[in-house]
Amino acid sequence: VTKLLSDEEWRTLMMAEAARARGVLTPPAAKRPACGFQDVKGRLEKVGLRPTRQRMTLGLLLFGKGDRHTTAEELYQEATQARANISLATVYNTLKQFSDAGLVREIALYGSRLWYDTKTGAHQHFYVEGEEHLFDIPAEDLNLADVRAPEGMEIVSVDVIVRVRPKTNS
């Protein structure tokens, strides 16, 4: 049996878990329950990713809050608050690996801003302009069942982002 995590890696993971327990990383109400160490390790192994210290730490931070939307910068800030020694480049690279493996869904906004969604099934989003906030559109509010692909084509996926902003009092 190969040891996958060193003692140092284990301590880092435990610090992240302790930060979550202290409320530094309090999960919001979410449809999917928060994941613990074994859940994250299992997710990584299931998609063929080795559970390295960085992947486990970021996986605990990312999936430990249930279904949510985040950016690499936000996840990096959470890792910093949890005292994880991880660079922003590592966060970007790990999120790319998670996306390629199907663990998160990548959502591009304005061509350069990337969000990551832990809910990978088919669903659409509202984006609040000026507030940098992305959230799910309730399935019953948007019916795309009647959309047909052009002749000779098939629909691979549907990505809808509805941009909204607060109403002005005029």
Q: What are the roles of these predicted feature ranges?
A:
Residues 1-38, 139-170:
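C-terminal regulatory/oligomerization modules of transcriptional regulators
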Residues 71-83:
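DNA-recognition alpha helix
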Residues 49, 64-68, 82:
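Short helix-capping/hinge SLiMs at alpha-helix to coil transitions
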Residues 35-48:
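Short, Lys/Arg-enriched N-terminal segment that forms or immediately precedes the first helix
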Residues 91-101:
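Basic amphipathic alpha-helical segments that dock to polyanions
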Residues 100-170:
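Non-DNA-binding regulatory cores of transcription-related proteins
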Residues 56-61, 74:
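Pre-recognition alpha-helix immediately N-terminal to the DNA-recognition helix
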